Design a protein with these regions (language model features):
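Non-heme Fe(II)/2-oxoglutarate
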Residues: 1-92
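Short, active-site-adjacent segments that bind or coordinate small-molecule cofactors and metal centers
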Residues: 63-64, 180, 191
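A short coil-to-beta-strand element that immediately follows conserved catalytic motifs
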Residues: 93-102
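Conserved active-site beta-strand element of glycosyltransferases/polysaccharide synthases
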Residues: 105
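Catalytic core of non-heme Fe(II) oxygenases with the double-stranded beta-helix
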Residues: 108-176, 188-191, 197-211
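Short proline/glycine-enriched turn/loop segments at secondary-structure junctions
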Residues: 181-186
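Glycine- and charge-enriched low-complexity intrinsically disordered segments
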Residues: 207-225
């Protein structure tokens, strides 16, 4: 049966069932859980600085999802981004340039506020790794929601509810389509975001690897060019 929301060229978003196998998703999920455990143990025994982010960190109160375990540029997930690039190019019909990954282990009560993403997230995907189900919503009209005086202002539309199972992913124009999640009612949910640029988009060359020398490096390697 034809899947709903499967035309990226038309809708600027689509759902890909079983983008990776359930076994690979579970492996990534358990790996990420263990990494969080390692971070917590090292932090508890003061083997790492509270400002260290190489094996993830708990987001600060002013970040997008506060007090939630987060990782910019997890090496395994950056490798996964490259693995999925041919599939992403097939789905979108675009030649893509990889930028970075961002992953979280969401907890009960977390909210992903309505927003649109920065330039590095032009072509994005959120991939369900495991845990409890948590829908993501997307507004298909790019004219809805905009930034005014440095603050994002939403039209508070109903949007489209997308439910992903482990291994499924939503591909979308992160810079054009508003997306969000309502308060999480489960206990834990693992997601990884993979971000690319279209090589026909002006400025993509200077943005390669999110302005880092290569993939896998932490955020402080970013440079303005």
């Amino acid at each position: 049966m034809k899947e709903k929301y499967n035309n990226f060229k038309k809708d600027k978003f689509c759902v890909i069932k079983s983008a990776i196998s359930k076994d690979l998703a579970l492996f990534c999920y358990n790996y990420f859980l263990m990494q969080r455990q390692v971070y917590e143990t090292c932090a508890q025994h003061r083997y790492i600085s509270p400002f260290e982010t190489l094996i993830g960190y708990y987001a600060g109160k002013n970040e997008q999802v506060p007090h939630t375990y987060t990782h910019y540029s997890n090496i395994a997930f950056e490798t996964l981004m490259l693995k999925l690039q041919p599939k992403m190019e097939q789905i979108t019909g675009l030649k893509l340039s990889p930028n970075y990954t961002f992953s979280r282990l969401y907890k009960r009560g977390d909210i992903l506020e309505r927003h649109k993403d920065r330039f590095s997230c032009e072509i994005s995907t959120t991939l369900n790794l495991g845990g409890d189900s948590w829908p993501i919503y997307i507004e298909p009209n790019p004219k809805k929601g905009k930034e005014i005086n440095g603050k994002y202002v939403s039209n508070m539309t109903k949007g489209i509810k997308i439910i992903l199972k482990p291994g499924d992913m939503l591909v979308y124009r992160g810079d054009k389509l508003e997306h969000w999640r309502e308060p999480f009612q489960g206990e834990i949910c693992g997601q990884v975001f993979l971000h690319y640029n279209n090589i026909k988009t002006k400025g993509y060359e200077k943005n390669l690897f999110d302005k880092r020398p290569h993939l896998g490096l932490p955020v402080w390697f970013k440079k303005e060019v």
